[in-house]
From Swiss-Prot:
GO cellular component: large ribosomal subunit
GO biological process: translation
Gene that produces this protein: rpmF
Keywords from the UniProt entry: Ribonucleoprotein, Ribosomal protein
Keyword DNA-binding in annotation: no
Name assigned to this protein: Large ribosomal subunit protein bL32
Ranges where the record places region Disordered: 1-20
GO molecular function: structural constituent of ribosome
Source lineage: Bacteria, Bacillati, Actinomycetota, Actinomycetes, Mycobacteriales
InterPro entries listed in its UniProt record: Ribosomal_bL32, Ribosomal_zn-bd
Keyword check for Ribonucleoprotein: yes
Length: 57
C-alpha cells in the first residue's frame, strides 16, 4: 500500500475529497401487472419476477 512521504494539509485533503461526487441511480421504466413503475436498472429483473413490492414507497 502506498504511504505518503509528507503530511497533507487539511485544506488540500478537503479540496481533494470535494472532487468526488456520488452519482444518482438511473431509473428505468418497467410495466408490472399493467402498472408502470420506475426502478433502478439493477432491480429490473426482480421487479419483473415480482420479488420486490413496487406499491410500497
Amino acid at each position: 500500500m502506498a504511504v505518503p512521504k509528507r503530511r497533507m494539509s487539511r485544506a488540500n485533503t478537503r479540496s481533494r475529497r470535494a472532487q468526488w461526487k456520488a452519482e444518482k441511480t438511473e431509473l428505468v421504466g418497467v410495466t408490472v401487472a399493467g402498472q408502470r413503475h420506475k426502478v433502478p436498472r439493477r432491480l429490473l429483473k426482480a421487479a419483473r419476477l415480482g420479488l420486490i413490492d413496487l406499491d410500497r414507497r
